C-alpha cells in the first residue's frame, strides 16, 4: 500500500484500550510515526456484545465515551510532555463493536500502511485468538504486536 515517491508509511494506526500494553503500543507507534514523518492514528473501540438489552447497551456506550475521552486526554498529556521536535502528528478516533472488525474497518478507511497493537494478557485469547493475532492472520497490513 506504499505510494510511489514516499519513503515509508504515510499512516500508522495504533489500537488502544487503556491497558498497559496498548499504552506501550501507542508510545511505540508514536516513535515510529515521528521518525518516519507519518501521521499516527490512535483508535479506541468500545466493545460490546450484540445481545444486550437497550438500556445496558446505552450504559455501555456512555461508559465507552468516558473511557475514550480519558484515553484522548492521556494521549494529549503525554504528547504535551515531549519536546516540540519529538512529537508525532496524530489524530484520535473512536468506534463501537467488535474490536477486530472495527480496527480492520478503520485501517481500511484511514488507508493505514501499518498497524501497531498491544499484546493481550487475557488467558482465553490463547485459545480463541486475540485481536492482535487476528489482525496478523488477516494479512492486509504489517502488524507490530507490542508486549
Where are these regions (language model features)?
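Glycine-rich, Arg-bearing micro-motifs that act as flexible, cationic patches
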Residues: 114-138
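Short, hinge-like loop/turn segments at secondary-structure boundaries
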Residues: 57-61, 109-111, 133-134
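Short secondary-structure boundary segments
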Residues: 44, 118-120, 147
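Structural beta-alpha unit
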Residues: 1-7, 80-115, 122
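A short acidic, glycine-rich active-site loop
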Residues: 60-73
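General small-molecule cofactor/ligand-binding pocket signal
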Residues: 43, 91-95, 144
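Small/aliphatic-rich secondary-structure junction motif
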Residues: 2-56
Amino acid at each position: 500500500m506504499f505510494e510511489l515517491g514516499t519513503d515509508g508509511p504515510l499512516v500508522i494506526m495504533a489500537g488502544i484500550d487503556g491497558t498497559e500494553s496498548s499504552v506501550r503500543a501507542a508510545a511505540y507507534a508514536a516513535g515510529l510515526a515521528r521518525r518516519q514523518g507519518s501521521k499516527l492514528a490512535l483508535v479506541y473501540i468500545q466493545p460490546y456484545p450484540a445481545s444486550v438489552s437497550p438500556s445496558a447497551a446505552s450504559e455501555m456506550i456512555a461508559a465507552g465515551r468516558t473511557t475514550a475521552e480519558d484515553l484522548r486526554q492521556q494521549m494529549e498529556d503525554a504528547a504535551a510532555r515531549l519536546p516540540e521536535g519529538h512529537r508525532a502528528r496524530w489524530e484520535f478516533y473512536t468506534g463501537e463493536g467488535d474490536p477486530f472488525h472495527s480496527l480492520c474497518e478503520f485501517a481500511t478507511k484511514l488507508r493505514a500502511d501499518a498497524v501497531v497493537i498491544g499484546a493481550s494478557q487475557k488467558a482465553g485469547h490463547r485459545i480463541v485468538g486475540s485481536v492482535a493475532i487476528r489482525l496478523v492472520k488477516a494479512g492486509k497490513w504489517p502488524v507490530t504486536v507490542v508486549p
